[in-house]
Amino acid sequence: MSTQILASSSQNEKIHKILRPTKKFQPPVWGERFLHYNISEQELRYKQQQVEELKEVVKKEIFGESAYDVSHQLKLINVVERLGLSYHFESEIENELESIYNKSVGQNYILKDENLHDASLRFRLLRQHGFRVSSPDIFEKFKDEDGNFKECLVSDTIGLLSLYEASHLSCVGENILDEALAFTTTHLTEFLANKKEHDDPLSREISQALERPLRKSLERLAARHFISIYENETSHNKVLLQLAKLDFNLLQSIHKKELSEISRWWKESDFVLKFPFARERIVELYLWILGAYYEPQYSMARNVLTKIIAFASLADDIYDEYGTFEELELLTEAVERWDIYIIDKLNPEYLQTFYKELLNSYEEFEQELPKEETYRVHYAKERFKELLRSYLEEAWWLKEERVPSFDEYLKISLISCGYHMLIVSSLIGMKSSIVTKEVFEWLSMDRKIIRASSTICRFMDDLAEHKFEQEKNDEPTAVECYMKQYGVSEEEAYDELNKQIANAWKEINEELLKPTGVASPILVRVLNFSKFMDLFYKNGDSYTQVGKVAKDSVAALLIDPIP
């Protein structure tokens, strides 16, 4: 909140003039590129039919044969998942993995001849699907008498890569996986350093993994990357590859059509003219939500949640950049009451505009739902109210030029990051029997998995923007608050926050193991929101300053089809 009020006297009359910020955010880089995209229903149906036909072939070829050994079947499942096709074969994959789990873990059957790659792959796939497998039981045999990973493993590059990926499924206190991560990172980095060319498939995989392991990668981006690698493997399955390409391009067409509709909503609402001080990032916001769920059946959910996150972004800029504290108090109170008849109490006009658009949109969400599901919107409203209360608290810190303690900061900032609001709101448009009132009640509590995802969101945002925030003299970040409470240097604060981010990932992994508090397809949204933070905030704030990461991601998922 950078608004100031200047007072001057003239003929015994005090005149107050509000100085609004003159700084403007980077303009949108996409223009109206997505506004006019269209694809006929006939063309979509044709593409869907092609995908359905190939799906049946794949079912028979891969999941219809029960004679394969465990190693072979795990590798097939891995390829299917990495090609982005797992959502087509959820029950088949789950059945196969449950069978493998019962054979190799549930009945204490030890695969003594299992190599490092196979053991790591088995562990990773089972953990990804919520099976509670013991890391020491699987990986202790790869250690020497001194408790270190055997030196002979250094030459097994494929095994090292597989172990590296598996280590990112660790839970709190799994020391053997922490050691595995350090061991594999060191030797995979050395492998690349000793190679003059990095164009071969293995080197490309290692480079990608070191930048972003599979556990932290958005599924569609990872699929796009792997399809090109898999195509260059001499032993690739042609039917699988063909299905992966067709499916990717089909989903891209569906997503582009959705983005076109969202872009028209943004343009017709005239938000750019009504809120010229705010970031115009509707394409990036849609990408954010696409990261949470890409499957075709969640089209309505994406539409609803993109609009909600757009309002959250507008509110963020109102509270951070534009409004006076008195205006922010008025808006917070009005949203708390959620009553269109009090709109006249909001001044200046931009507050009325925001309030009216917000309430009208949530009313439209209710109208789009069956009557028995309209209760969902109530839970989303409550989280949005909570979000604005946290924004107001942070605005007060800035107004008072106050740096809170780290503990006090966390109470507010883990709400103001917006992830609790988004996670609850993400269920509004999900057409699924697993979304019930009990699920909303469960998610509305302070759950460990939501707190962990919010921690990743808040700390990665703060670390990415710390220098920028300091130059703007904006509200304090986790860095200043940690330094203040614990009397440490900036570098020490950075190290501690990064440790807490790593620990939060482990907590998410643990919360996704069976039995879960609510159905896994719901909790996966929490995981996916965390993945997006790693993409957009690992090397800076790619939302506010749209650069290569954002541009490449949008191009890969929403512009360029796979040939």
From Swiss-Prot:
Q: What class of enzyme is it?
A: lyase
Might you give the EC number(s) for this enzyme? Answer: 4.2.3.104
Pathway in which the depicted protein is active: Sesquiterpene biosynthesis; Secondary metabolite biosynthesis; terpenoid biosynthesis
Copy out the cofactor comment.
Answer: Binds 3 Mg(2+) or Mn(2+) ions per subunit.
GO MF term list:
alpha-humulene synthase activity; magnesium ion binding
Q: Which cofactor(s) does the record list?
A: Mg(2+); Mn(2+)
Query: Which Gene3D superfamilies does this chain map to?
Result: Farnesyl Diphosphate Synthase, Terpene synthase, N-terminal domain
User: Which Pfam families does the annotation name?
Assistant: Terpene_synth, Terpene_synth_C
- Name the keywords, alphabetized: Lyase, Magnesium, Metal-binding
Q: Which residues bind Mg(2+) 2?
A: D316, D320
What SUPFAM superfamilies does the record point to? Terpenoid cyclases/Protein prenyltransferases, Terpenoid synthases
- What does the record give as the reaction this protein catalyses? (2E,6E)-farnesyl diphosphate = alpha-humulene + diphosphate
Please name the GO terms of the biological process aspect recorded for this protein, alphabetically. Answer: diterpenoid biosynthetic process
For domains, the record's comment is: The Asp-Asp-Xaa-Xaa-Asp/Glu (DDXXD/E) motif is important for the catalytic activity, presumably through binding to Mg(2+).
Function (record text)? Sesquiterpene synthase that catalyzes the formation of alpha-humulene. Can use farnesyl diphosphate (FPP) as substrate, but not geranyl diphosphate (GPP) or geranylgeranyl diphosphate (GGPP).
| Family classification | Belongs to the terpene synthase family. Tpsa subfamily.
Q: What is this protein called?
A: Alpha-humulene synthase
Q: What is the lineage of its organism?
A: Eukaryota, Viridiplantae, Streptophyta, Embryophyta, Tracheophyta
